Amino acid sequence: MIDFGQIFQGSYASVLMAKAGADVIKIEPPHGEPLRQRAPPGRATTLPFAMLNANKRGITLNLKLPRGREMLFEMVRRADVLLENFGPGAMDALGVGWSVLHEINPRLIYATGTGYGISGPDRDNLAMDLTVQAASGIMSVTGFPDRPPVRAGITVADFMGGDMASLTGGPSITLPFLLPSSTSRADVVMNSLPASVTR
């Protein structure tokens, strides 16, 4: 599994896969994944980054350079799954979107986690756990009766998004492996944060 997961949603999906036995290769840009960058001065990483990237191998690739893309294409030839949770179109803009990768490996399962999906009127809106908690109504059932709504204590939309994408959810990464036609599997598995908390 090639893992471009970042922050919580993508990284949680791939760590669940790694803990279930998948060989996961975490790919970071040269400057590091955003969750790693939150480390205090003098530290190389954060505890959440370490927890969400356990059981994974890791490399850095610069997909803005031809050599970085060539290295990714070599990995894709042998991969079963590629997971990313960038904004819609980010992988296409780098020249490594689904249509390109599918040509290289027709059996590849391409899993994408976005804020609001890959189509529809809100696809280009950026999302984060807090805004999705508010928009989905989760915050209407948290907090205190005499005060404004309060966010849930954990990043529930992000973690539910990762769970939905990986092992237990509806359009999950594992589903194509379980189907009788799995010898010719190839699919785009899409999950959005609002769908994760309203299903």
Regions found by a protein language model. Give the residues of each.
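N-terminal helix-loop segment corresponding to the beta1-alpha1 unit
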Residues: 1-168
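Compositionally biased, low-complexity repeat tracts
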Residues: 28, 166, 182-183, 191
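Alpha-helical hydrophobic packing sites
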Residues: 131, 160, 175-176, 185
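Low-acidity, Ser/Thr- and Arg-rich intrinsically disordered low-complexity segments
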Residues: 172-174, 181-185, 192, 196-199
